[in-house]
């Protein structure tokens, strides 16, 4: 029998610590098995992490993000890369999450160290595919990431 998993401060501290130690500045803690139809995870995020603008094209790949600790900025883009909406997502704030339909370009900026979000989307896991990464933004590891990430963060100054 599977046991309940609690989203408590001990888990938050563990995931935040692993995110801080990660070269990518983020860490996933899965509550699901990879073959389950619903993927649920806590994601620890540090300001250094780069989550490039992307979308999920499969009709069943909508996702919901809820901030459990800290502050994130979410940017919604049109097909050409213009920001059409943005919002600060903050645990205990006016807006703590977003439900993103499939096909919507979005990117995240971590505005507070040791932030943690809960993410839910349909499984199974599938890497971002052709046409899902924004053609107008650098990919993780490419030249220009630092400048683009600074621009993304500046949208919340």
Q: What spans do the regions from the language model cover?
A:
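Double-stranded beta-helix
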Residues: 82-83, 107-157
């Amino acid at each position: 029998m599977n046991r309940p998993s609690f989203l408590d401060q001990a888990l938050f501290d563990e995931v935040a610590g692993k995110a801080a130690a990660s070269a990518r500045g983020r860490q996933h803690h899965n509550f699901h098995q990879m073959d389950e139809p619903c993927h649920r995870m806590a994601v620890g995020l540090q300001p250094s992490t780069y989550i490039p603008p992307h979308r999920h094209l499969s009709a069943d790949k909508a996702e919901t993000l809820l901030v459990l600790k800290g502050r994130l900025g979410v940017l919604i883009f049109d097909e050409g890369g213009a920001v059409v909406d943005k919002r600060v997502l903050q645990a205990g704030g006016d807006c703590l999450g977003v439900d993103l339909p499939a096909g919507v370009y979005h990117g995240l900026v971590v505005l507070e160290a040791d932030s943690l979000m809960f993410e839910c989307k349909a499984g199974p896991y599938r890497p971002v595919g052709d046409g899902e990464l924004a053609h107008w933004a650098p990919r993780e590891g490419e030249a220009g990431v630092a400048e683009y990430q600074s621009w993304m963060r500046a949208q919340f100054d």
